[in-house]
Design a protein with these regions (language model features):
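Two-component/phosphorelay signaling modules centered on CheY-like receiver
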Residues: 7-24, 93
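Conserved phosphotransfer cores of two-component systems
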Residues: 37-40, 62-71, 91-93
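Receiver (REC) domain active-site loop signature in two-component systems and cognate sites
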Residues: 51
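Hydrophobic/aromatic residues positioned on beta-strands within the core alpha/beta folds
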Residues: 76-78
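C-terminal output helix
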Residues: 100-112, 120
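Acidic, metal-coordinating helix/loop segments flanking the phosphotransfer/catalytic sites
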Residues: 25-44
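Active-site residues of response regulator receiver
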Residues: 48
Length: 126
């Protein structure tokens, strides 16, 4: 699952991954959350952090409130805007779950492979 409010970024990410993964795309976190609430639980979510309505951190927290701890996250960002988002980015970077824009396709694949192989116990809320 890819969640990004920028259509161009969303399309590029999907194209980079569609040959290797089953990709679903959402332009906002609320729509992605609604899909997950209906039982469409992905193995991994690639999400922008800075999005209107619901940012990546709030999206992450809502997924965890649903009790979905098996879904892994890889966050992408152009840089923190608030102190709260900076702290969240630091936590995700420490876990190897953050990719800074701009990035190349091979960097995305490497980060995604690393995310998929990390143990769920490494989630910061545990």
């Amino acid at each position: 699952m890819i969640v990004d409010d920028n259509q161009l970024v969303l399309t590029l990410l999907a194209r980079m991954l569609q040959n290797e993964y089953n990709v679903t795309e959402f332009m906002d976190a609320r729509s992605a959350l609604a899909a997950i609430e209906t039982g469409k639980i992905p193995d991994v979510i690639i999400s922008d952090i800075m999005m209107p309505k619901m940012d990546g951190q709030a999206f992450y927290e809502e997924i965890r409130k649903l009790g979905s701890y098996s879904t892994r996250f890889l966050f992408i960002t152009g840089g923190a805007v608030t102190e709260e988002s900076l702290e969240f980015e630091r936590k995700m970077a420490a876990l190897g779950r953050l990719l800074l824009k701009p990035f190349e396709a091979d960097q995305l694949r490497a980060a995604l492979n690393k995310t998929l192989t990390l143990q769920g116990a490494l989630e910061y809320e545990h």
